[in-house]
C-alpha cells in the first residue's frame, strides 16, 4: 500500500451554519484547523478540495495545497473522486482518506488509525467508530450507529449502518465517525454505483457500498471528534480548542 493521500472536501453551502469552513476559531478559519490536524497525522500529503476561492486562499495562506472542484457534485464522495484525478492523475496513491471539513478538534492519531484495516486486502473501505456512552445518543437519529462483528483488535466488519438504536440486546452500541479511507479502485466503483434502496431510506451514503457487496471495516477509537453543524457546536469547538491551547 502506497502512502495515502488525504483529501478534505469543503464548501460553503451549509444550511444550519452558513460559511461554516471559514468560521473563526481561535483566530483561524475552521478549515485551517482541520487541515493542520490532517497534516499532523503524518501519513501522507493533504489537499483541500473546494469550489470556493476563499477556502482555497485560507489554506494556501498557510502553505497548504487546495484544488478547485465543480460546484454541483451530488455528494462529497463525487467531489473527492474529481479532486483525486486532479491531484494524482498518474495513480501514485492507491489509498485516499476523506476527512470531513467540519472536524476541527479531530485527533490526528485517529486519522492515522483509519487506514489500518486496508492492510487486509479483502477490505474495500475503512472507517472509524466509538462506543456510545451517553444514553440520549442511543436513540438519537442524528447519531449514526454501525452494526458489525469483531474481526480483530479494536476492529469491526460493518454489516449495516442505521439511525435507529441497534443492535438489540446487551452489549455496546457504536457511533459511526464519518471519516473514510478508500482503496482508489473502491472509490471509483462507489461513485459509479446508483443510489441504493437502503441509502435512500436511511439517507446514509455508505449503505450504497454495503448493498453492492463492498466490505467496510471500522477501527474502534476512544476519541469522538466534534462535528460542527450548528452555532452551538461552533461555540463548543471554540471552547475545546481554547482549553487545548492553555494546556
From Swiss-Prot:
The Enzyme Commission number assigned here is 2.7.7.38
Q: Which InterPro entries match?
A: Cytidylyl_trans, KdsB, Nucleotide-diphossugar_trans
Recorded GO MF terms: 3-deoxy-manno-octulosonate cytidylyltransferase activity
A single GO cellular-component term from the record reads: cytosol
> NCBIfam families this protein is in?
kdsB, PRK05450.1-1, PRK05450.1-5
Please name the source species.
Methylorubrum populi (strain ATCC BAA-705 / NCIMB 13946 / BJ001) (Methylobacterium populi)
Q: Which GO terms describe its biological process?
A: CMP-keto-3-deoxy-D-manno-octulosonic acid biosynthetic process; lipopolysaccharide biosynthetic process
Question: Record's family?
Answer: Belongs to the KdsB family.
Q: Pathway, per UniProt?
A: Nucleotide-sugar biosynthesis; CMP-3-deoxy-D-manno-octulosonate biosynthesis; CMP-3-deoxy-D-manno-octulosonate from 3-deoxy-D-manno-octulosonate and CTP: step 1/1; Bacterial outer membrane biogenesis; lipopolysaccharide biosynthesis
Protein's recorded name: 3-deoxy-manno-octulosonate cytidylyltransferase
Record's keyword terms, sorted: Cytoplasm, Lipopolysaccharide biosynthesis, Nucleotidyltransferase, Transferase
Amino acid at each position: 500500500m502506497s502512502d495515502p493521500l488525504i483529501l478534505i472536501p469543503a464548501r460553503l453551502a451549509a444550511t444550519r451554519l452558513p460559511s461554516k469552513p471559514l468560521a473563526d476559531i481561535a483566530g483561524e478559519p475552521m478549515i485551517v484547523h482541520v487541515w493542520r490536524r490532517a497534516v499532523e497525522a503524518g501519513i501522507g500529503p493533504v489537499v483541500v478540495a473546494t469550489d470556493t476561492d476563499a477556502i482555497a486562499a485560507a489554506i494556501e495562506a498557510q502553505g497548504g495545497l487546495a484544488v478547485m472542484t465543480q460546484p454541483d457534485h451530488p455528494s462529497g464522495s463525487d467531489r473527492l473522486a474529481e479532486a483525486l484525478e486532479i491531484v494524482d492523475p498518474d495513480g501514485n496513491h492507491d489509498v485516499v482518506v476523506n476527512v470531513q471539513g467540519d472536524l476541527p478538534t479531530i485527533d490526528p492519531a485517529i486519522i492515522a488509525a483509519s487506514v489500518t484495516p486496508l492492510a487486509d486486502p479483502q477490505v474495500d473501505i475503512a472507517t472509524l467508530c466509538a462506543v456510545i456512552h451517553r444514553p440520549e445518543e442511543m436513540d438519537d437519529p442524528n447519531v449514526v450507529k454501525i452494526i458489525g462483528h469483531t474481526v480483530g483488535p479494536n476492529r469491526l466488519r460493518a454489516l449495516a449502518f442505521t439511525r435507529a438504536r441497534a443492535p438489540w440486546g446487551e452489549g455496546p452500541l457504536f457511533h459511526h465517525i464519518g471519516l473514510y479511507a478508500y482503496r482508489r479502485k473502491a472509490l471509483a466503483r462507489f461513485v459509479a454505483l446508483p443510489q441504493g434502496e437502503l441509502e435512500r431510506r436511511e439517507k446514509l451514503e455508505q449503505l450504497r457500498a454495503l448493498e453492492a457487496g463492498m466490505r467496510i471495516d471500522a477501527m474502534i477509537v476512544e476519541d469522538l471528534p466534534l462535528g460542527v453543524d450548528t452555532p452551538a457546536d461552533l461555540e463548543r469547538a471554540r471552547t475545546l480548542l481554547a482549553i487545548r491551547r492553555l494546556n
